[in-house]
Amino acid sequence: GFGYDLHPRLPQSAEGADENWSWAYMFDRMYRGDMEGLFAFGMNPVSNGPHSKKVVSALSKLKWLVVAENFEQETAAFWRDDIQALVDQTPADVATEVFMLPAANFAEKDGAFVNSARWIQWKWKAVDPPGEARPDQEIIARIFLAVRELYAREGGVHPAPVAALDWWYSNPASPSLDEAAKEINGWATE
């Protein structure tokens, strides 16, 4: 039940353990050319990562990068002259296609926030986001709905997980965080 058989499986090491996909290992995979793309929401790895030069080199090896932010930061602009100079490259050396999506900032969206001190807190938005900026869950929902429509129209590799996903939210293009929290925690069905 619950579609668990449709979930992708983590690759296993020679010892049979799941491979590590935490921050440092993920960027190491990018650096080796083992990843094609990255969605970066609420993170600026070029500025905040433990090894900025390696992060810039790793991002340069991706086919695509999607950055959802309320302003252009170093990760979204990693291909520019001033940042590429860190790794002795020029923008011409970078084949990564970068997509910048306008996202709401912390004061423009409801949600939970976690920090490195392991605090978690809930907050409500103070103001609506300007222009085309959207909260993260709306950006993700719109990408999912477009991909599902594309799979339905054109088919593709492994369409079952996308086609079978139950997207029951009252507003499918902008799911309520309350509804998402209920889904994560579970609720009585009878």
Across the structure, where does each feature detected by a protein language model lie?
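Non-catalytic alpha/beta scaffold blocks inside enzyme catalytic domains
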Residues: 1-189
